[in-house]
Amino acid sequence: MNNSHNKIIMLGTGSAGVTRCYNTCFFLKTADTSLLVDAGGGNGIMSQIEKASINLTDIHHMFITHAHTDHILGAVWVVRMIMHRILGGEYKGNLNVYGNDKVINTLKQICLMTLHKNYNALFGSRIMLCEKLSGDEFQAGDISMQCFDVLSDKEKQFGFRAIMPGGATLVCMGDEPCNRANFPIARGADWLMCEAFCLYKDRDVFKPYEKFHSTAMDAGAVAAELGVKNLLLYHTEDKTLATRRTEYAREAAQSFKGNIFVPDDLEAIDID
């Protein structure tokens, strides 16, 4: 395989209440696999997938970190539209959805209560809901995954460590600060994806700590301690988009001397 196919495609980069960008979600894409991680808070996910030039018929794996609205409600739309294509004979194979018990139960209940019975009949045959426990290892296409509990006090949430074709390692911390108990699984990763709700200098405006979030400065300090090579910041406020890339990177760089990425919606980043 040509490893240059390995990419992160950020469909959205914002936190829950944003209106000027989409909620944080992304693809991990290889030559053979399009793994969707979270789906934002509504059917805007369909537009983002289309703009990213990804076909729904190529999506066979979805990982949902937790059951908050800005992460799971878009997944209902992805499942619905894939169900529609299955029934129309346009979609080959299965859709595998991975998540903890709360995620899987929530997604299925919303679908059962809102979708046509012909769609819901596909659960267990073509739509496979794969409940995972913390520490479970599994394959999402050609991406090797290990999920872990981020130990949130707010909502049961899983992050993951992924090994891409070619061996690059990527750790996604979900949308909460990295708990020190999870430092071993993230240490030395090639890529760390970490939330940064706002700048530390703007903490009194956006109040990240009251919302169980962190700042760009905090994320940089964690990345430095973990010895990762690349830090990607996401799940931000949307009031400073014009300066976000420069200012967030500058603040994180106070501690972290590796590569820092602060992507916009629909930006693709090579991860080889």
Model regions and ranges:
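Active-site-proximal loop/helix segment associated with metal-binding centers of metalloenzymes
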Residues: 18-20, 129-201
